[in-house]
UniProtKB/Swiss-Prot annotation:
InterPro entries: TDU_repeat, Vg_fam. It is found in: Nucleus. Residues 57-80, 175-203, 233-256 are annotated as: Disordered. Enriched in placenta. This is Transcription cofactor vestigial-like protein 3. May act as a specific coactivator for the mammalian TEFs. Pfam families: Vg_Tdu. GO terms for cellular component: nucleus. Belongs to the vestigial family. Residues 64-75 have a biased composition (Acidic residues). It comes from Homo sapiens (Human).
Length: 326
């Protein structure tokens, strides 16, 4: 047996390398021969070593999983078990004092909410106070808008301005600056004796009824007076015809009796009925009384009628009367 045969054992066909015999290498150091490994063989060796490492790593992980499962099974077992009846068994898994654990849990939760969101807690507290602050500011602004007399106990709301003229004896009390019945300047009936134009009526704005509809029916007498001075004979029959038409007081038929005190003095005098006599006898007296009343009231003051606010009714009647004359 040669030295080469001793060093190299026979290998099957296709072996990648020959491993020397250590005994032969010691006896024949010169005959020791180890061929260089090829690149493909190195890759195979690296893959094999990695597989062994992965197997070694997975084995302890499986053991850890098994240990954890065993611990969970032990935890799932109830700490106490109480038999209530044949169909009910009470298992208690909690170990320790339940009350102390619950208190600790809620105190910890509340403490974390305050420490994590301090701004939100402050904003919520402000939001709870803002409606009260807004209400107080709104009340203070409203209090400043009203007069001081409104907040006193002796304050009384002022009456409507039109109530002062319902009756001359009716007294209206109110704070200064409101309408009073003692001041006759706003009413047009008290200004007819003046020669200059009367101031505009300030109370007519609050009166819902137009003044022309109240006094316009009685202006036929004034028209008769006016036509008597300018056309004494040409239209006498027309005046008598109008007189027969207005024999009964026209203002009383057109107006409600409750509006009687609101009329002017001359109109109020014209509305007083004459004694019940013959029509032919009362005709001159009625014409004379109405003519004298209107002539005395409107002596030199016919031009002030448009300033009082009766121009619309007068113009309308003048246009209706001019059609048969001209």
């Amino acid at each position: 047996m040669s030295c080469a045969e001793v060093m190299y054992h026979p290998q099957p066909y296709g072996a990648s390398q020959y491993l020397p015999n250590p005994m032969a290498a010691t006896t024949c150091p010169t005959a020791y021969y180890q061929p260089a490994p090829q690149p493909g063989q190195q890759k195979k060796l690296a893959v094999f070593s990695k597989m062994q490492d992965s197997l070694e790593v997975t084995l302890p992980s499986k053991q850890e999983e098994e240990d954890e499962e065993e611990e969970e099974e032990e935890k799932d077992q109830p700490a106490e078990m109480e038999y209530l009846n044949s169909r009910c068994v009470l298992f208690t898994y909690f170990q320790g004092d339940i009350g102390s654990v619950v208190d600790e849990h809620f105190s910890r939760a509340l403490g974390q909410a305050i420490t994590l969101h301090p701004e939100s807690a402050i904003s919520k507290s402000k939001m709870g106070l803002t409606p009260l602050w807004r209400d107080s500011s709104a009340l203070s602004s409203q209090r400043n808008s009203f007069p001081t007399s409104f907040w006193t106990s002796s304050y009384q709301p002022p009456p409507a301005p039109c109530l002062g003229g319902v009756h001359p004896d009716f007294q209206v009390t109110g704070p200064p600056g409101t309408f009073s019945a003692a001041d006759p300047s706003p009413w047009p009936g008290h200004n007819l004796h003046q020669t200059g134009p009367a101031p505009p009526p300030a109370v007519s704005e609050s009166w819902p009824y137009p003044l022309t509809s109240q006094v316009s029916p009685s202006y036929s007498h004034m028209h008769d007076v006016y036509m008597r001075h300018h056309h004494p004979h040409a239209h006498m029959h027309h005046r008598h015809r109008h007189h027969h038409h207005h024999h009964h007081p026209p203002a009383g038929s057109a107006l409600d009796p409750s509006y009687g005190p609101l009329l002017m003095p001359s109109v109020h005098a014209a509305r007083i009925p004459a004694p019940q006599c013959d029509i032919t006898k009362t005709e001159p007296t009625t014409v004379t009384s109405a003519t004298s009343a209107w002539a005395g009231a409107f002596h030199g003051t016919v031009d002030i009628v448009p300033s009082v606010g009766f121009d619309t009714g007068l113009q309308h009647q003048d246009k209706s009367k001019e059609s048969p004359w001209y």
